[in-house]
Amino acid sequence: MAGLSSSQIPDGEFTAVVYRLIRDSRYSEAVQLLSAELQGSPRSRAGLSLLAYCYYRLQEFELAAECYEQLSQMHPELEQYRLYQAQALYKACLYPEATRVAFLLDNPTYQTRVLRLQAAIKYSEGDLPGARSLVEQLLSGEGAEDSGGENDYDGQINLGCLLYKEGHYEAACSKFLAALQASGYQPDISYNLALAYYSSRQYAPALKHIADIIERGIRQHPELGVGMTTEGIDVRSVGNTIVLHQTALVEAFNLKAAIEYQLRNYEAAQEALTDMPPRAEEELDPVTLHNQALMNMDAKPTEGFEKLQFLLQQNPFPPETFGNLLLLYCKYEYFDLAADVLAENAHLTYKFLTPYLYDFLDAMITCQTAPEEAFIKLDGLAGMLTEQLRRLTIQVQDARHSRDDESAKKAVNDYDETLEKYIPVLMAQAKIYWNLENYPMVEKIFRKSVEFCNDHDVWKLNVAHVLFMQENKYKEAIGFYEPIVKKNYDNILSVSAIVLANLCVSYIMTSQNEEAEELMRKIEKEEEQLSYDDPDKKIYHLCIVNLVIGTLYCAKGNYDFGISRVIKSLEPYHKKLGTDTWYYAKRCFLSLLENMSKHTIMLRDSVIQECVQFLEHCELYGRSIPAIIEQPLEEERMHTGKNTVTYESRKLRALIYEIIGWNM
């Protein structure tokens, strides 16, 4: 029936055809027919009513509200149209307009429904006292003419939502559990419960309820194509149907992604997003779009920024969008853009940024022009947070001493949250001195924070780095690198390649060559196993370890051994040559060429020939490999022909020929 026009429908069959389309959930086609029919009969009550219904089912809430507004003007005696208009306006997030229309309803028949709607509006606007007052009216049975008062599980849900917004997550869980027991399984209530568990950092029960939602969704609605995209199966969009909304699958997968992301299981987080029912990008809801931007930021930063900037123009957008966009601008050092967004959106600053986050961003932006002033701002923030951490430490001790498990649990959660705020402030302070290469001062900053951070992986990793960079503290660096590596020894490729490389160098510099060789054998064995399982996968860990060791020998002046190590580390080229590995290799070659041009070193002809052959291989295999990863929002892009390993390897080869006087 696709493309059917009014003229093709036999006389007397129009209504039956429209109802069949609605029955089959083919609302878009019904809208086409009804819109055409209403051009001839614009005051048709039946036509407008059906059109409004179809728009509502298509989630075109503003258009539905317009239809209901026309109906309420044509038939002011039928107050249900005004109620439907208010509901559609609420769904369209037009809260002031929805409130205005709802206040016009004074029919006792609709009083309970109006109270529910007004409570929902106030809740969405963030007016929690106003929402609570209306919910309590409903629970007391006021305005109960049409439904006998708020039924038990509806009341529990409403109270649970209010408690959740107020930050009382445990109490919210109790309400949602009570509602679930009273109503039987409901996907939306299960999702609310999972969300409350997530917010109270109880990830295991949250994941249990998410798994339940997903399992039931797959079993009851196989047509929604859950997991198809992850499996690489090309499937068409399932659209934003009412059925999809009722399953709560989209919400469940987004929450699963958030939990995995918090647990640093980044691949699992990305998989959760691709597992959800397939939809076209223009059909994605704001939360999914926001999560896609965050999860894929490392691989597709330009797209990520575009999505977050787009969301900021929408009404509504996920409340985390504003802060995350600003933090990412700072991470990628777009401080001017962060400052512009803050200045242009002062009204969002007070609504979506906590005082802590605002002060942190302000200090980060100040770093660009006034690092000393920024350090003072960060120091003030750090002082406030350390006071909170000390106070919470005492609370934890007191609660444990009095065997108050509930208070102890809450204090521990609060401590962890405060520590997660403190670490970025500390790292921002350290980075100011790191950029000045004042490594002793960085070490001093870290030592001041040992009281709170000695068990934190990020802190331990950065302490290791700063000890390593001082070149006379390799033994101390080993003390911090080793636990990180041993913690993940059975899955050693999950450890950053630079951590493994720095540990190997530290072993070599402290004459622990056997330990270095053992670690490299372990990495090689893991890489061989991974290559066996996935022959096409590029793995760079051992390559980068060898490159860093080669760089070390070059830095010590032993270019014969160092350059040979660098060259061998990139074999086979089709698997080992990449942007990161080329970066390490070319640094050694540039250092070599600089010293050759100054005549401070002499190389054997065989080594020079080896260098030329290496660069020829890089030229051959590096045609599609970027020499550098450009900043995502760079206005002036490099010439695509110049930003390749091939181009840079030719340049280096030409320099070799020039220095040794060979004719090209």
Swiss-Prot record:
One of its GO terms (cellular component) is intraciliary transport particle B. The keyword Repeat applies. It comes from the Eukaryota. GO terms for biological process: intraciliary transport. Gene3D superfamilies: Tetratricopeptide repeat domain. TPR repeats lie at residues 11-44, 45-78, 153-186, 188-220, 385-418, 423-456, 458-491, 543-576. It is found in: Cell projection, Cilium. InterPro entries: TPR-like_helical_dom_sf, TPR_rpt, TT30. Its main location: other. Keywords: Cell projection, Cilium, Cilium biogenesis/degradation, Coiled coil, Repeat, TPR repeat. One of its GO terms (molecular function) is intraciliary transport particle B binding. It holds the Pfam family TPR_16. SMART domains: TPR. Residues 507-534 form a coiled coil. PANTHER family: INTRAFLAGELLAR TRANSPORT PROTEIN 70B (PTHR20931:SF7), TETRATRICOPEPTIDE REPEAT PROTEIN 30 (PTHR20931). Interacts with the IFT B complex components IFT27, IFT46, IFT74, IFT52, IFT57, IFT80, IFT81 and IFT88. Interacts with KIF17. Belongs to the TTC30/dfy-1/fleer family. Required for polyglutamylation of axonemal tubulin. Plays a role in anterograde intraflagellar transport (IFT), the process by which cilia precursors are transported from the base of the cilium to the site of their incorporation at the tip. This is Intraflagellar transport protein 70B. It comes from Rattus norvegicus.
